[in-house]
């Protein structure tokens, strides 16, 4: 079972980002992978919706002890009893690879956690937010520091993002 995490901003998001997130979720499901996310709103909700529309399985790694914040498209809600930042660590550790759609401060934390834990991240650059800016601040455009622990990947389309994520997962199995 392949598990792909989707990270991106919560709250209200522009319609273009809604559509991209939904397309990411749909493509994850069509490729036979399980979608993992923080399970609440924003990018997480639209990605979950896209996966459900394609009959995919959606897991929400939720903050707190209740399912009150879970979006309507979550099949398996997992309450962590943790704050948003700590539940993100569980999301990162539970994912085989992650796709970054847009993003704010919390998404940067998830990106950093993924890098520290050697998890492949594909950054969907046209989605705006930090996804559009990471390359400009990354070390040699591809790393979060000079140790070059794991290369960040960039994609211009959703299909390209999934192709890269799945190939990185396959390489990590070897």
Which residues make up each language-model segment?
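Short, amphipathic alpha-helical "lid/cap" segments that border enzyme active or binding sites
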Residues: 25, 158-163
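Short, hydrophobic alpha-helical segments
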Residues: 165-174
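Acidic/glycine-enriched connector segments
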Residues: 19, 26, 30, 41-111, ...
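C-terminal binding/interaction regions
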Residues: 2, 8-12, 81-159
């Amino acid at each position: 079972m392949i598990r792909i995490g989707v990270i991106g901003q919560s709250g209200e998001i522009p319609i273009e980002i809604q559509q991209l997130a939904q397309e990411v979720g749909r493509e994850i499901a069509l490729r036979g992978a399980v979608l993992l996310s923080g399970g609440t709103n924003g990018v997480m909700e639209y990605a979950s919706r896209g996966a459900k529309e394609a009959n995919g399985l959606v897991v929400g790694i939720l903050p707190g002890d209740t399912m009150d914040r879970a979006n309507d498209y979550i099949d398996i809600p997992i309450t962590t009893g943790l704050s948003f930042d700590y539940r993100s660590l569980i999301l990162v550790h539970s994912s085989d690879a992650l796709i970054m759609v847009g993003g704010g401060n919390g998404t940067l934390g998830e990106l950093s956690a993924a890098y520290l834990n050697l998890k492949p991240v594909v950054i969907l650059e046209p989605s705006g937010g930090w996804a559009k800016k990471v390359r400009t601040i990354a070390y040699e455009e591809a790393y979060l520091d000079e140790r070059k622990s794991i290369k960040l990947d960039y994609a211009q389309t959703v299909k390209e993002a999934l192709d890269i994520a799945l190939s990185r997962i396959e390489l990590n199995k070897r």
